[in-house]
């Protein structure tokens, strides 16, 4: 049985308040977003900047990754602000 169809609170029959349920959903969404962000940064920045993986990053690779992550985060912030101000 998956987590969406399992009874709340371990199947004891007690109900979960809407507030507790909402906090749980928010936490799960935040975790999923963080995992997706890390994967996106890996594919967009690491794969772009590190052409020959080794035991450590070179100076140019490190600065390339830093710039890439910075640009991606800035673009994400601009898009988020734009979406939330349109509502």
Swiss-Prot record:
Question: Which tissues is it found in, per the record?
Answer: Expressed in roots, flowers, young cotyledons and leaves.
Supply one GO BP term.
Answer: protein transport
* Keyword list, A-Z: Chaperone, Disulfide bond, Metal-binding, Mitochondrion, Protein transport, Translocation, Transport, Zinc
Q: Record's InterPro entries?
A: Tim10-like, Tim10-like_dom_sf
The subcellular location is: Mitochondrion intermembrane space
UniProt cross-references to Gene3D superfamilies, sorted A to Z: Mitochondrial import inner membrane translocase subunit tim13 like domains
| Entry keyword Chaperone | yes
The answer to whether UniProt assigns keyword ATP-binding to this entry is no
Q: Where is this region: Disordered?
A: 1-20
Quote the Pfam families the UniProt record gives: zf-Tim10_DDP
Name which cysteines form disulfide bonds. Answer: 45-68, 49-64
Question: GO: which molecular function terms?
Answer: copper ion binding
What is any one of the record's Gene Ontology cellular component terms? Answer: mitochondrion
Q: Where is this motif: Twin CX3C motif?
A: 45-68
Domain comment as written in the entry: The twin CX3C motif contains 4 conserved Cys residues that form 2 disulfide bonds in the mitochondrial intermembrane space. However, during the transit of TIM13 from cytoplasm into mitochondrion, the Cys residues probably coordinate zinc, thereby preventing folding and allowing its transfer across mitochondrial outer membrane.
Protein purpose: Mitochondrial intermembrane chaperone that participates in the import and insertion of some multi-pass transmembrane proteins into the mitochondrial inner membrane. Also required for the transfer of beta-barrel precursors from the TOM complex to the sorting and assembly machinery (SAM complex) of the outer membrane. Acts as a chaperone-like protein that protects the hydrophobic precursors from aggregation and guide them through the mitochondrial intermembrane space.
How is this protein organized at the quaternary level? Heterohexamer; composed of 3 copies of TIM8 and 3 copies of TIM13, named soluble 70 kDa complex. Associates with the TIM22 complex, whose core is composed of TIM22.
Q: Which family does it belong to?
A: Belongs to the small Tim family.
Record-given protein name = Mitochondrial import inner membrane translocase subunit TIM13
Q: Which source organism?
A: Arabidopsis thaliana
